[in-house]
Amino acid sequence: MTKRALISVSDKAGIVEFAQELKKLGWDIISTGGTKVTLDNAGVDTIAIDDVTGFPEMMDGRVKTLHPNIHGGLLARRDLHSHLQAAKDNNIELIDLVVVNLYPFKETILKPDVTYADAVENIDIGGPSMLRSAAKNHASVTVVVDPADYAVVLDELSANGETTYETRQRLAAKVYRHTASYDALIAEYFTAQVGETKPEKLTLTYDLKQPMRYGENPQQDADFYQKGLPTAYSIASAKQLNGKELSFNNIRDADAAIRIIRDFKDRPTVVALKHMNPCGIGQADDIETAWDYAYEADPVSIFGGIVVLNREVDAATAKKMHGVFLEIIIAPSYTDEALEILTTKKKNLRILELPFDAQDASEAEAEYTGVVGGLLVQNQDVVKESPADWQVVTKRQPTDTEVTALEFAWKAVKYVKSNGIIVTNDHMTLGVGPGQTNRVASVRIAIDQAKGRLDGAVLASDAFFPFADNVEEIAKAGIKAIIQPGGSVRDQESIEAADKYGLTMIFTGVRHFRH
């Protein structure tokens, strides 16, 4: 009996060659719509789908393959006489191979001018139905959803006259991943359209971006996946211009650096980062000087770190960075001369290009954190804050210079691991106290790191001071201005201590924990 294949694809890559090889092997080919036209024009003889169903395509192609003659031919178990007899009694011919890929729903909704009607029309119904039917009956039917699998299928058919069960099972699993991902994108789109923020079912889909050598440690297996609907400012969207593949830890650090730089759009800024904590942030009127400040903030910790810049890298800045061992440099662009400088004798230096300012982060954009057996979902911490809403709670008002420095410090401390403290002036970080289990310890670390540079310095805390001992330490160091959220039941004790030492202190009313 002649074997039959059903081919209906939106992605025509390689399909003519695939179909030609099937014909050489003696297969009949059923086809639909544009796929049939493509194959017929290439000289590949095909059978029209309506010749199989006895029913014309209708409703602009919405109904063409949803028919017992198709799904019966796919689902009939070859090992059950009753199934084969039912097919014979109803004049249903068996289908042994299905090659289908789906309407481009993802590509459609990514278009900036997409309409709701366009999105709906690009939801495939018949394609997923055929794929699922064929995949369910993978004991007998081969199903292909990815052109990358054409070669292995042809190789096995040529060698054995059929595919192996292992191949059919693997391809079936791929189909179910594919259709699940397809439906997840549709669900995500419709959920957003109706404004549902707390759906009872959360469906997320990600595409494999990069298999990794290992994870956080060498004994951990790992892979990097990109969101099904890519985010413009994500590390997953960066273009790598030089260097080795990014490691697991590289990606996490780079992500943290990109999050930080988004808050510093108004002036040229450089962020240096290690272990997901900023070790240096510099801001100036030009990117070269901003680099100088970021480097001077902590020339020890920057060694082996990640640097992200929010302006084009020029030759002068590149020369300075070239002299420092860095793992990664991220910037929106590089001059040709800068790129030549950075890559000279630095084949392993990872240089990334990312227009991360193309889109502001939105509070509505969810952030996911995995726990054992569960997933925490929250909005990103990108609330718009205005200094006009801040409250000076001490007797002394801050000077204009202090206000500028406090605004800078408040942006910077948001990305320090809690308990997070940062000491800055108006253009660079001076000391960072991250991740201590008590706040006064973080205060001491930040101050110790800033020693010798505390004249005119200010201090920011990501959360309130639970006790006045923090203010005591700050005053003892000679720092005269503090910014913190406030909100402790002992706020008054901290205010009184600040007044006692002539400090100025601002309450923002917004906490920025980062675990």
UniProtKB/Swiss-Prot annotation:
The organism's place on the tree of life at top rank: Bacteria
Matching InterPro entries: AICAR_Tfase_dup_dom_sf, Cytidine_deaminase-like, MGS-like_dom, MGS-like_dom_sf, PurH-like
Keywords: Hydrolase, Multifunctional enzyme, Purine biosynthesis, Transferase
Involved pathway(s): Purine metabolism; IMP biosynthesis via de novo pathway; 5-formamido-1-(5-phospho-D-ribosyl)imidazole-4-carboxamide from 5-amino-1-(5-phospho-D-ribosyl)imidazole-4-carboxamide (10-formyl THF route): step 1/1; Purine metabolism; IMP biosynthesis via de novo pathway; IMP from 5-formamido-1-(5-phospho-D-ribosyl)imidazole-4-carboxamide: step 1/1
Regions annotated as coiled coil: none
Free-text note on domains in this protein's UniProt record: The IMP cyclohydrolase activity resides in the N-terminal region.
Name listed for the protein in its UniProt record: Bifunctional purine biosynthesis protein PurH
Gene encoding the protein: purH
